[in-house]
């Protein structure tokens, strides 16, 4: 039995639980901007990635474009089952995906032997999702902004996917809290493996906010 994780940059991952292939928060091609517009913050991928083949599940933590990226989701077959937060479910529904399970924090569903429990994630502004994933091949927790659900009990896990740095704006504070959450995750889950997410990959940002984004810490310091 094997549990494998392949990083796709930003928040994207391909998780493999034996032969079950789960794509998480993919950003594979095109630019990235938020509802305020690209003048404020725009991300560009210098190199596009093809969509991985033979997928069994699409798992989305948030409905924002850096998690539910419409141009990337458009690459995927519409009969691919989707599990996501309420806001993510609205995005994939608008794109014509056929089988969508919307989860609120605390709710659980099962897909081909994988138990998916939604946990309370980042308030952006509505509370989005992290996930506790349990399969015979292994157990994994992921949340892309460093917000740990206080209701999750202590339990040993095989892997944790989390940011390892803090990202924020002056006067507003951190909206990604990797430095502070990593020690809590280690204490609560005693993971065999910690995998750094969110701030990695080959991404170029522009716009008014790009020059004042603050990053504190590093993978080496936090790990």
Report residues per predicted region:
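Cap/insert and terminal regions of metallo-dependent hydrolase folds
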Residues: 87, 149-223
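Active-site environment of divalent metal-dependent phosphoester hydrolases
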Residues: 31, 63-68, 89-92, 107-110, ...
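Zn-dependent metallo-beta-lactamase
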Residues: 1-44, 191, 209, 217
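Active-site neighborhood of phospho(di)ester-bond hydrolases with catalytic His/Asp-centered motifs
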Residues: 24-25, 55-68, 83-86, 141-146, ...
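Pre-active-site segment of Zn-dependent metallo-hydrolases
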Residues: 20-59, 70-72, 148-154
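Portal/gating segments that form or line small-molecule/metal binding sites
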Residues: 58, 76-91, 95-124
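A short acidic, amphipathic alpha-helical/loop segment
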Residues: 71-75, 91, 95-96, 151, ...
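Catalytic core of the metallo-beta-lactamase
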Residues: 8-18, 110-161, 174-181
């Amino acid at each position: 039995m094997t549990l494998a994780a392949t990083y796709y940059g930003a928040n994207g991952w391909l998780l493999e639980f034996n032969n079950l292939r789960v794509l998480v928060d993919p950003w594979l091609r095109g630019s990235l901007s938020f509802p305020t517009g690209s003048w404020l913050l725009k991300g560009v991928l210098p190199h596009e990635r093809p969509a991985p083949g033979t997928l069994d599940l699409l798992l989305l933590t948030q409905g924002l474009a850096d998690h539910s990226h419409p141009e990337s989701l458009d690459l995927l077959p519409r009969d691919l089952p989707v599990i996501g937060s309420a806001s993510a479910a609205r995005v994939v529904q608008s794109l014509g995906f056929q089988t969508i399970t919307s989860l609120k924090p605390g709710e659980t569903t099962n897909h081909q032997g994988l138990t998916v429990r939604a946990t309370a994630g980042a308030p952006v502004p509505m509370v989005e999702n992290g996930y506790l994933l349990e399969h015979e091949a292994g157990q994994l927790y992921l949340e892309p902004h460093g917000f740990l659900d206080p209701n999750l009990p202590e339990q040993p896990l095989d892997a944790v996917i989390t940011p390892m740095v803090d990202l924020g704006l002056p006067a507003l504070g951190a909206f990604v809290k990797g430095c502070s959450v990593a020690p809590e995750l280690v204490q609560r889950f005693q993971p065999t493996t910690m995998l750094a997410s969110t701030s990695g990959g080959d991404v170029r940002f522009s716009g008014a906010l790009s020059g004042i984004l603050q990053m504190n810490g590093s993978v080496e310091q936090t790990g």
